[in-house]
Amino acid sequence: SRIRSGECQAPHSSATMKPSLVSSPSPGINIGAVERETGLSKDLLRVWERRYGFPRPARDAGGERLYSPSEVSKLRAIKRLMDVGIRPGKVVHQSLDALHALAGERASDGGAGAVPELVRDVLALVRAHDASALQHLLAQRVMRQGLQPFVLETVAPLTRAVGTAWMRGDLQVFEEHQFTESMHVALRTAINTFPRTPEGSPRVLMTTFPRETHHLGLLMVEALLAPEGAHCISLGTQTPVEDVRRAALAHRADIVALSFSAAYPLRVAIDGLETLRAHLPAQVAIWAGGELTRRVRRTLAGVALISDLAGTIPALRDWKARRGAPPGR
């Protein structure tokens, strides 16, 4: 991360400086680095500054925002709570200790304790930077469980546990990234063992809208659909709505599946879904999944909201039944 030292002082004394300028040599972290460290967009950070009075960055001599390390730690904690469905306005004024306590409660409620030995082993390997051993452990787990149970019973709780450890400061950013990459490899390797889907299989286009950077959720959905005989086409993350439309037509998609984390702006998601629905043929189904969908309080015409990851499997089976497709296709 790029750290700005705040060494540049205005030529006047501190008494004549504007309050917004840095008046001490303590380090500050620029907004781009904070965005990378926390996963919170620059726009969102500015909105919170106006709406909640937090964070309250200092300014360097050039007027650029500089965030303190303690603010970044708190922002990271809030982001992790947002990822499990907590609204930022409810926690933004709580202390870091209180945020950590709440995260611990949510981790327990979310079932991270269901595999305590596995969580302990995985965290130990991540901290030891033993990527090879971690990859082997995950591969063995996939073989023992099967892909769909692995996603629902292992990937989900492990991801929560690693996220909580990162939020508490027990893992560094690069260590969480190492875990995520290892999980990507395990899932992609398992998905690739399934045979090529025959002609007539449901074609599922998968992506996220701009500003949604979470890719693991897409891969988890693909891992649930592949054993059901779906032909999945992933565009990765952050695809503009118009490009989603073009890709759906080009790939002859039967279903467009979009993933939204809890932190994604609700209004932006709804507008994008409604725009996409209006410009795709009626026979192309649109699925919206992820934590954000729990906050949608009204029906979106022509859009299926799937807030529970496990609900992806029956959704595909229902789609097949309505179209008279054979169960394995």
Stretch-by-stretch model annotation:
Residues 37, 41-195:
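Long amphipathic alpha-helical segments
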Residues 29-30, 43, 76, 220, ...:
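Short Gly/charged-rich anion-binding patches and loops
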Residues 1, 5, 13-14:
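Serine residues within intrinsically disordered or low-complexity segments
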Residues 34:
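Short alpha-helical "recognition helix" segments of helix-turn-helix
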Residues 12-29:
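A detector for short, charged/polar N-terminal pre-domain segments
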Residues 5, 170-172, 178-329:
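C-terminal regulatory/effector modules of DNA-binding transcriptional regulators
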Residues 31, 45, 273:
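Generic structural marker for isolated residues within well-ordered, non-membrane alpha-helices
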